[in-house]
Amino acid sequence: MKALIIDDEPLARNELTYLLNEIGGFEEINEAENVKETLEALLINQYDIIFLDVNLMDENGIELGAKIQKMKEPPAIIFATAHDQYAVQAFELNATDYILKPFGQKRIEQAVNKVRATKAKDDNSANAIANDMSANFDQSLPVEIDDKIHMLKQQNIIGIGTHNGITTIHTTNHKYETTEPLNRYEKRLNPAYFIRIHRSYIINTKHIKEVQQWFNYTYMVILTNGVKMQVGRSFMKDFKASIGLL
């Protein structure tokens, strides 16, 4: 699991980081001390669990929690604070738990186990839905090049881009170039994994390595093979929804 700790007190962040490392099972534990850092972190990573203080320097934690809950796939929120008077508001936001400072490892572990149990159920449901969608699509994509037809496994396709009449298909181990238009491939790709982010680009969301803020309030997507593809302004809403930012 990936965790994000949001607190404007360094000591509180350090303590929570230490306790989570003691509990174990976390792939990544990151920290943010304000709203700006939080939004940047949520843009780059998809977190499973967030520890959120109520009192932040630039915004009330309850208000920030409400914004996070509007994401397409919001992380579990655990309020970790010294103030008990916001508990009702927190649970109205469907918070997973509400923990008071000073933190105890057993209490933190109880909250983490709640998230793990819920995540296991959600993952099973999501896998079932993805399998149903995949059943309606071929697992391979036929690509004709020089009188040969290459059968590319869709799971190995990282992204597809077109420029000056040449369509380039990036896979995990090769790059294919063809004169076939991008639209031809878009119709054959599994929408459970692929999304068009620009009139010239289609990406596999499973191969997103990093997302950077770009010019004109757009994003630059860096894929797992290092290729960069820009998100077009008219595609921003769908892209943000696909990575859980709406």
Curated annotation (Swiss-Prot):
Residues 2-116 form the Response regulatory domain. Keywords: Cytoplasm, DNA-binding, Phosphoprotein, Transcription, Transcription regulation, Two-component regulatory system. It is found in: Cytoplasm. It comes from the Bacteria. One of its GO terms (molecular function) is DNA binding. The modification 4-aspartylphosphate is found at residue 53. This is Transcriptional regulatory protein LytR. The lineage of its organism: Bacteria, Bacillati, Bacillota, Bacilli, Bacillales.
